[in-house]
């Protein structure tokens, strides 16, 4: 890390600092309303989102593996954090966040960052779209100004609450929501350099204060005053009993945070022609999530939209991310008394737009049109995210993807019998020597097919079975088990297996399972011709 910063400082100039300063301020302006919105949607007071934005934002910029990454609370976390708050409470959310930070650090230390990239795209698109639907529909109540609603962890229960309380809709809330929605759609075309969410909050707050004060819920009426001071340091209640019940939620936060941050880093790489360090990024995210709860902040991760904005506004180094965090803190200290007047209804369109933008609509539609195994994985993951939980959806989605991949790989394995004439075997020995070429990995998805084909061959009762395995890169434990059965059955009928061209990796697998010794070292050959000559000589001698 010291080397990274020394290299950055070495070529740093005032011109670059001015660019980083501008980019950091612009991203900070965008981050402020989003941080409050995400916190409220997660079931906690808005200041906890702001604390997360500046603490995690600064730490990830210093310690992370991508020099353009902007971290903070994100929309993807909303359903997960809301579920934890409803089930365990805010204090336990801090504990779960800190535990997730430790897990992220361990993932980075043990270099799991490269493995996270192998999570199938249909799984990530499925749960991201599911989260988007949950966020969007979760804001309908605030958009309409419904009162008396209880929050639930279940999507269906929340939709039922909306239905039961539709008659409590507030005209002023709907009016404010519509004004903010219009601002979000119109202002980016008129003033693209100024963040539309900030303009929307300023305009709607001014309208509400001037024309109908006290007619609709505000941040102040719902959550009280926002402290205009630096957040106090407080260590969460990390007792064994507390941590043991929060292992599951912490793991979900860590996995989702790791995936989101690495996706954001990949986007930054594509925009800047740079290359991030996946494992260092996870460590940076981990440190941020360990420290942030000590200041009351909610879990954070890399934010794709804010990272892209940082780059588009001329950021040249990690300094822009640090400035973004400092700007958010200064804004909190100065503007907290004003922020309490922001209508809750003005937050709803901002979150709805976030949900719309994160839904990956085009990719979702493309995978649906494929009508393949990927389509099934996508639909199952999406539905489980909405109607069950993110934990269940990712587990089932990954399991289904692995099963379908194994099936596809298993069917792609080739087992081809070579005719004796083509192998130049003496005519009188044709029936006593069978030769098979095997292509593809011998793993659990292909092991049974391999066994079935070979068993058919040995029922003809050849004396020697030559397996050409030069194109077999790996043999897993399941395939070893089936191989044992083949060798055992063939030995019973007095036959001998000869193996040719075996790779070093596959050979180590057979040695570890004991198969290498059972078959006998003298029955392994580099070339098929050598195995044929061995079999012919043995048969001619009457062996």
Summary of predicted features, one role per range:
Residues 23, 181, 185, 448, ...:
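Short, contiguous clusters of charged residues that form electrostatic/catalytic patches at enzyme active sites
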Residues 518-534:
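Short acidic-hydrophobic, aromatic-tinged amphipathic segments that line or gate anion-handling sites
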Residues 326, 506-507, 526:
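Short secondary-structure capping/turn micro-motifs that flank functional sites
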Residues 70, 499, 524:
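Conserved SAM-binding loop
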Residues 81, 162, 450-454, 531, ...:
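Generic hydrophobic alpha-helical segments
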Residues 265, 269, 308, 507, ...:
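Residues within alpha-helical segments
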Residues 357-513, 517-518, 536, 542-543:
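The feature marks cytosolic C-terminal regulatory regions of anion transporters and related permeases
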Residues 1-413, 514:
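Transmembrane helical cores of multi-pass ion-transport proteins
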């Amino acid at each position: 890390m010291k080397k990274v910063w020394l290299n950055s400082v070495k070529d740093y100039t005032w011109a670059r600092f001015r660019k980083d300063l501008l980019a950091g301020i612009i991203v900070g302006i965008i981050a402020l309303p989003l941080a409050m919105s995400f916190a409220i949607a997660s079931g906690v007071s808005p200041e906890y989102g702001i604390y997360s934005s500046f603490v995690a934002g600064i730490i990830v910029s210093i310690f992370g593996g991508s020099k353009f990454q902007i971290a903070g609370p994100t929309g993807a976390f909303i359903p997960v954090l809301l579920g934890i708050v409803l089930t365990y409470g805010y204090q336990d959310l801090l504990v779960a966040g800190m535990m997730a930070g430790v897990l992220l650090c361990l993932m980075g230390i043990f270099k799991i960052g490269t493995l996270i990239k192998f999570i199938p795209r249909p799984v990530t698109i499925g749960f991201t779209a599911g989260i988007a639907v949950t966020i969007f529909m979760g804001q309908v109540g605030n958009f309409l100004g419904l009162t008396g609603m209880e929050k639930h962890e279940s999507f269906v229960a929340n939709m039922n609450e909306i239905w039961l309380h539709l008659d409590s809709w507030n005209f002023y809330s709907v009016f404010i929501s519509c004004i903010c929605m219009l601002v979000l759609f119109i202002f980016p075309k008129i003033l693209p350099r100024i963040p539309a969410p900030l303009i929307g909050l300023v305009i709607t707050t001014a309208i509400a204060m001037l024309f109908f004060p006290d007619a609709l819920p505000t941040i102040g009426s719902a959550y009280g005053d926002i402290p205009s001071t630096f957040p106090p340091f407080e260590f969460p209640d990390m007792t064994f009993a507390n941590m043991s019940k929060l292992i599951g939620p912490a793991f979900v936060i860590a996995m989702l945070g790791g995936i989101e941050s690495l996706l954001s880093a990949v986007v930054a790489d594509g925009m800047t022609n740079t290359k991030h360090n996946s494992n260092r990024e996870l460590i940076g995210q981990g440190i941020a999530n360990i420290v942030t709860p000590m200041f009351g902040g909610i879990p954070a991760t890399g934010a794709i939209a804010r990272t892209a904005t940082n780059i588009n506004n001329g950021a040249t180094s990690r300094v822009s991310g640090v400035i973004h965090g400092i700007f958010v803190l200064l804004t909190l200290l100065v503007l907290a008394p004003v922020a309490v007047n922001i209508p809750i209804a003005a937050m709803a369109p901002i979150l709805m737009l976030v949900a719309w933008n994160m839904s990956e609509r085009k990719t979702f539609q493309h995978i649906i049109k494929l009508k393949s195994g990927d389509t099934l994985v996508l639909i199952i993951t999406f539905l489980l995210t909405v109607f069950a939980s993110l934990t269940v959806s990712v587990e089932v989605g990954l399991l289904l993807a692995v099963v379908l991949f194994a099936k596809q790989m298993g069917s792609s394995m080739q087992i081809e019998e070579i005719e004796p004439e083509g192998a130049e075997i003496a005519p009188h020995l044709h029936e006593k020597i069978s030769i098979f070429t095997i292509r593809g990995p011998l793993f659990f998805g292909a092991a049974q097919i391999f066994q079935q084909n070979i068993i058919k061959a040995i029922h003809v009762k050849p004396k020697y079975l030559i397996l050409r395995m030069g194109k077999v890169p790996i043999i897993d434990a399941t395939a070893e088990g089936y191989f044992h059965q083949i060798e055992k059955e063939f030995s019973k009928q007095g036959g001998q297996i000869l193996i040719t061209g075996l790779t070093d990796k596959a050979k180590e697998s057979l040695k570890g399972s004991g198969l290498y010794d059972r078959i006998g070292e003298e029955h392994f050959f580099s070339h098929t011709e050598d195995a044929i000559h061995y079999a012919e000589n043995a048969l001619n001698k009457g062996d």
